[in-house]
Amino acid sequence: MGSEMCIRDRIKAKHGAAFSNKYTIADDSGLVIPELNYEPGIYSARYAGDAASDLDNRKKVIKKIENISKQSLDAYYVCVLVGLRANDDPMPIISEGKIHGRVSINSIGDGGFGYDKIFYPRGFNLSMAQIDSETKNKISHRAIASKNFLLQFK
């Protein structure tokens, strides 16, 4: 899944660098559920359709979990960052971050967005939407990818 995101990010970063003539960083993130053929993956934002809301997307995941008579499934969030110094940069910075956990048919919490209400990270008895923002900003897939990116950037 990360390789598809990397390819998409590299294209986005190349367009950004060509347009701005400045250092460009592209991000692609998503929820991956291996038992559901690695869905929603790169289609996470529009899983239930182009005009789908976060609620629509969560409902589609929940329905698929229920269709296979499960309460939850292993899953992970993944974020890929690609940084280019110029449109033709031969050595882009590429960074990936993942957080593993489970997606559940139980949608709980007021915080976050996307699939956070049904994603329960490993080591927590809370959904991502229930975890305080300070903690979430330390453990999330985006935080991990950002830290890895900055280490390479130096």
Regions found by a protein language model. Give the residues of each.
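Anionic-ligand binding patches
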Residues: 4, 8-154
